[in-house]
Regions:
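Short, conserved catalytic-motif segment at the N-terminal edge
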Residues: 2-57, 76-78, 95-99
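Active-site SXXK
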Residues: 11-16, 29, 35, 55-86, ...
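Alpha-helix N-cap and coil->helix boundary residues
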Residues: 26, 78-82, 190-194
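Residues at or immediately flanking beta-strands
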Residues: 26-28, 82, 167, 209
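Short, surface-exposed loop or secondary-structure junction motifs
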Residues: 93-249
Length: 249
């Protein structure tokens, strides 16, 4: 087994290589053994330190999945149940098809309803593939301002891209928005408040939040993109996903 020093040396070398090869512009890594930290590495300058905050974006889905599984463990949701058990409108979802002019039409009825398990595993077909992306593009901005409004829209205006459970296709927004909304309904709490109470506070994670303070914003790590071969910092104003459902703020 490598020593703690060898592990840190390997991580530092990997970070230096990625920086030199322009594969990344900075990062932070920590290794724990038996629940105890054995090394930490930071590369990319002063803005990548032990107190830097990182935007999670769709990595928020990990917390959403954990929240649903905890609710299942507590007997408050059934992941094998149809989504319509919590949001009745989802009983009437149809499989859709794209028309030649880029619109979406109902094509057929699915053989069964989608379940929470389908949403967790990206096998529901909701908000997936080209059809799902198109429906999200067509979704009025006013319907994206809260989980409640977004979930209602998904249940009444969206279509499935394929038969539930027949295959997997990533759902960037809709699937996990619906799961987060179900968590709100069964707990009577906002999704962010539930995660804080169930995970962030008990685990001592004060910097994991849906609503960063000005002090926390000041510690955000930079985001960059390559423009004509050079790294250029992207200046996000406030919350990156402001105006989208709470799952992604």
């Amino acid at each position: 087994m490598p020593t703690d020093a060898q592990i840190k040396e390997a991580i530092d070398a990997l970070g230096a290589h990625q920086l030199a090869a322009h594969e990344c512009f900075g990062g932070a890594a920590a290794v724990l053994r038996g629940g105890e930290p054995i090394c930490e590495s930071y590369f990319g300058g002063d803005r990548f330190s032990g107190r830097a905050l990182f935007r999670l974006a769709s990595m928020t889905k990990l917390f959403t999945a954990a929240a649903v599984m905890k609710l299942a463990e507590d007997g408050r949701v059934d992941i094998g149940a149809p989504v319509s058990a919590y949001l009745p409108a989802f009983a009437h979802l149809k499989i859709g098809a794209l028309t030649a002019d880029g619109q979406v039409r109902a094509a057929s009825m699915p053989r069964r309803e989608i379940t929470l398990f389908d949403l967790l595993t990206h096998t529901a077909g909701l908000g997936a593939d080209t059809l799902g992306n198109r429906e999200y593009d067509l979704m009025p901005p006013a319907e994206k301002v809260s989980l409640a409004r977004a979930a209602d829209w998904y249940g009444t205006a969206f279509h499935l891209a394929f038969e539930p459970g027949s295959r997997a296709a990533y759902s960037g927004f809709a699937g996990y928005d619906v799961l987060a909304r179900i968590a709100e309904l069964v707990t009577g709490m906002s999704f962010g408040a539930y995660l804080k109470a169930a995970f962030f506070d008990p685990l001592g994670m004060p910097d994991t939040t849906f609503a960063p303070t000005p002090e926390q914003y000041a510690r955000f790590s930079p985001v960059q993109k390559r423009v004509r071969g050079e790294e250029v910092e992207v200046n996000f104003r406030g919350e990156v996903f402001r105006g989208l459902p709470t799952t992604y703020e």
